[in-house]
Swiss-Prot record:
GO terms for cellular component: nucleus. One of its GO terms (molecular function) is ubiquitin protein ligase activity. Residues 172-345, 513-554, 583-669 are annotated as: Disordered. Its main location: nucleus. This is Probable E3 ubiquitin-protein ligase IRF2BPL. There is a cross-link at K79 (Glycyl lysine isopeptide (Lys-Gly) (interchain with G-Cter in SUMO2)). Residues 605-619 have a biased composition (Polar residues). The gene is IRF2BPL. It comes from Macaca mulatta (Rhesus macaque).
């Protein structure tokens, strides 16, 4: 006998489904042998009722176990008793009544099926139920339909739609058993206990099945693993026939796949997180029901058909970012966004690097450029910043804040403009086409298309709030961008506007130095340049600090910002007196130098022209802050086109400490006495040149620089070299030659604290503590081989 024949002979037919089963798959605890599948399908609490109904139908229709293998042999001594005619008639009558009831139930179900036909069709499209998991009753109608169970199966299938709104673990109170009322509560898989049977009480003892089938738990677990995570039934379905009848128990293979994968609450698309790039919004998900959108099940909004199990990271990421265009699920949605974000960061870093390079080299490069290029840049720079917007979507705003001219070897100069978009975001674009492309992508959600010329898609506002928007290409036509023609007339130039909500320009983040803005109400001096380099430097520095002092927080480092605020608080009054009491007029620019840029307009009226470009300010403390960007040791002399000294151009910044002379030749950074700020000092020979930090109003009339007189030692009144002398950081008029400083140090004693050579204990800025020389400074001043060159008479 072959193995197949042996296996076939061992199989037994289930009383309900009529399919051959192995002995371990059969359950003998009921009146008829049934398989575990039928018990799980019908439920352990009503399987006896189904067996009885099937028995009556079989007797009525003559469907007996003719070709089936017999069940377990009856015990020895028990004889099979044939039914009498009276019993057969009673059974036939009962079967007829059951058949009539089943027929009536089928009619009711057909009406409900017609009403829910559309809904079921939609479910079939959305829910890809595996065909192999469909119950045998659908594949073989000759099985259960002839037993009258098709009505219950159809009712369960029709009621599956109502379950879609319920979570997998949301179960109603346990249904009342049809056979008895003593069953325990049902488990989440729809069964009353282990193996689908109620858990026995201690008085009842273990059920018979546990004694006969010790491996039933593992068998049930294997069935559950083959069927997926839902090895049992899902209860809680309302009775499709209405009324207060018992709730149905539906097998998992009749439920939509979305309900088996996870709870309905997990299917709701969460709001997407805010985008990392500026104010650009995230992709808008498709509307419910649309291809690729979160289709709603059963007409209930908020329940997505794309939900997945909680452990499925791929599906959850798709639910977060939405479904891709065209109804397709992109395989790497998150990776695509990450790549795009990474490219955007790289592009912004490159643009900031270009801006930093432009600001760093502007002083030298602009002075060496042709006159047409220089004049155009100065004119355009005097109009910044001003707002621009996208022509097709007026809500997309940016601002132009800087210009430059670039050229490749053998090529003509071409205008480069720097645009911040969105306004206040810090994202910098170095071309009009780049920002126009980004605006187009934000507007149209098209990441693949580029624009030919950004000047055709950008508009600028001539005056803020006027509503007079003009095409940027009209202001900057191709002839102007290549410096073939000059900038159009003044009627085309925009007026500068600085938004109070986002005053910090990207130039403040990359510029090497910033001049603190003057207090509100301070007048603006027209810039004057003693040389071409000075004019370009003044333009760069004016551009580097457009923000008012009360709104500069957030973009600078905390320490630097605190020093700036302290510096401005101490210098505000002195700065006013420097410009008002002095009453200087701006001298004309040097011959051959570039013309001065136009005075700032609009909100720029409260800005202060850097003192380096206006040497009439004399020892203005702003020079100390501005001169860091200049090359060390290149201070302007009186021969550079101005009759006044520009010693302040070589003054070094110090906000809260005495400024010391250089301790060693060459460029060196000396730590200040209180360690707050590194001090940059440099002349090539050993020198003592402290930078100025505080301007006392009462000392301004006595200052040689303010009076346009020569530099003289305060003690011996000898003329000083304009870059080599000892400067008191507190009192501008305290200037000393090296011999007098040397004598003062020796008189005070070099081993102790050495104060100002004037004999006074000049206090530090903002405190009563006097400043004193550092040991390195003392050693430099006491060096005997230092020969100081005296200034000759003009």
């Amino acid at each position: 006998m072959s193995a197949a024949q042996v296996s076939s002979s061992r199989r037994q037919s289930c009383y309900l489904c009529d399919l051959p089963r192995m002995p371990w798959a059969m359950i003998w605890d009921f009146s008829e042998p049934v398989c575990r599948g039928c018990v799980n399908y019908e439920g352990a609490d009503r399987i006896e009722f189904v067996i009885e109904t099937a028995r009556q139908l079989k007797r009525a229709h003559g469907c007996f176990q003719d070709g089936r293998s017999p069940g377990p042999p009856p015990p020895v001594g028990v004889k099979t008793v044939a039914l009498s005619a009276k019993e057969a008639a009673a059974a036939a009558a009962a079967a007829a009544a059951a058949a009539a009831a089943a027929q009536q139930q089928q009619q009711q179900q057909q009406q409900q099926q017609q009403q829910q036909q559309q809904q079921q069709q939609q479910q079939q499209q959305l829910n890809h139920v595996d065909g192999s998991s469909k119950p045998a009753v659908l594949a073989a109608p000759s099985g259960l339909e002839r037993y009258g169970l098709s009505a219950a199966a159809a009712a369960a299938a029709a009621a599956a739609a109502a379950v879609e709104q319920r979570s997998r673990f949301e179960y109603p109170p346990p249904p009342v058993s049809l056979g008895s009322s003593s069953h325990a509560t049902r488990l989440p898989n729809g069964l009353g206990g282990p193996n689908g049977f109620p858990k026995p009480t201690p008085e009842e003892g273990p059920p018979e099945l546990n004694r006969q089938s010790p491996n039933s738990s593992s068998a049930a677990a294997s069935v559950a693993s083959r069927r997926g995570t839902h090895g049992g039934l899902v209860t809680g379905l309302p009775n499709p026939g209405g009324g207060g009848g018992p709730q149905l128990t539906v097998p998992p293979n009749l439920l939509p796949q979305t309900l088996l994968n996870g709870p309905a609450s997990a299917a709701v698309l969460p709001p997407p997180p805010p985008h990392a790039l500026g104010s650009r919004g995230p992709p808008t998900p498709a509307p419910p029901g649309a291809p690729g959108g979160p289709a709603c099940l059963g007409g209930t909004p908020g329940v997505s058909a794309t939900s997945s199990s909680a452990s499925s990271s791929t599906s959850s990421s798709v639910a977060e970012v939405g479904v891709g265009a065209g109804g397709k699920r992109p395989g790497s949605v998150s990776s695509t966004d990450q790549e795009r974000e990474l490219k955007e960061k790289q592009r912004n870093a490159e643009a900031l690097a270009e801006l930093s390079e432009s600001l760093r080299n502007r002083a030298e490069e602009w002075a060496n450029k042709p006159k047409m290029v220089r004049d155009t840049l100065l004119t355009l720079a005097g109009c910044t910043p001003y707002e621009v917007r996208f022509k097709k979507d007026h809500s997309l705003l940016g601002r132009v804040f800087a210009f430059d001219a670039v050229s490749k070897p053998g090529m003509d100069y071409e205008l480069k403009l720097f645009i911040e978009y969105p306004t206040g975001s810090g994202n910098v674009y170095s071309s009009a086409s780049g920002v126009a492309k980004q605006m187009y992508q934000d507007c149209m959600k098209d990441f693949g298309r580029g624009l030919s010329s950004g000047f055709k898609y950008l508009e600028y506002e001539k005056k803020h709030g006027s509503g007079d928007w003009r095409l940027l290409g009209d202001l900057l036509p191709e002839a102007v961008r290549f410096f073939k023609e000059g900038v159009p007339g003044a009627d085309m130039l925009p007026q500068p506007y600085l938004d109070a909500s986002c005053p910090m320009l990207p130039t403040a983040l990359v510029s090497l130095s910033r001049a603190p803005s003057a207090p509100p109400g301070t007048g603006t001096l027209p810039p004057a340049a003693p040389s071409g380099r000075g004019a370009a430097a003044s333009l760069r520095k004016r551009k580097a600090s457009p923000e008012p002092p009360d709104s500069a927080e957030g973009a600078l480092k905390l320490g630097e910002e605190q020093q700036r605020q302290q510096w401005m608080a101490n210098q505000s009054e002195a700065l006013k007196l420097t410009m008002s009491a002095g009453g200087f007029a701006a001298p004309g620019h040097a011959a051959g130098g570039p013309p001065p840029p136009p005075p700032p307009l609009g909100p720029h009226s409260n800005r202060t022209t850097p003192p380096e470009s206006a040497p009439q300010n004399g020892p203005s403390p702003m020079a100390a802050l501005m001169s860091v960007a200049d090359t060390l040791g290149t201070a302007h002399s009186p021969k550079d086109g101005s009759s006044v000294h520009s010693t302040t151009a070589s003054a070094r910044r110090n906000s809260s400490s005495p400024v010391s002379p250089a301790s060693v030749p060459g460029q060196r950074r000396l730590a200040s006495r209180n360690g707050d700020l590194n001090l940059q000092v440099a002349p090539p020979p050993p020198s003592a040149h402290p930078g100025m930090d505080q301007v006392h109003p009462q000392n301004i009339p006595d200052s040689p620089m303010a009076n346009s007189g020569p530099l003289c030692c305060t003690i011996c009144h000898e003329r000083l070299e304009d870059t080599h002398f000892v400067q008191c950081p507190s009192v501008p008029s305290h200037k000393f030659c090296f011999p007098c400083s040397r004598e003062s140090i020796k008189a005070q004693g070099a081993s102790g604290e050495v104060y100002c050579p004037s004999g006074e204990k000049c206090p530090l800025v903002g405190s009563n503590v006097p400043w004193a020389f550092m040991q390195g400074e003392i050693a430099t001043i006491l060096a005997g081989d230092v020969k100081v060159k005296k200034e000759r008479d003009p």
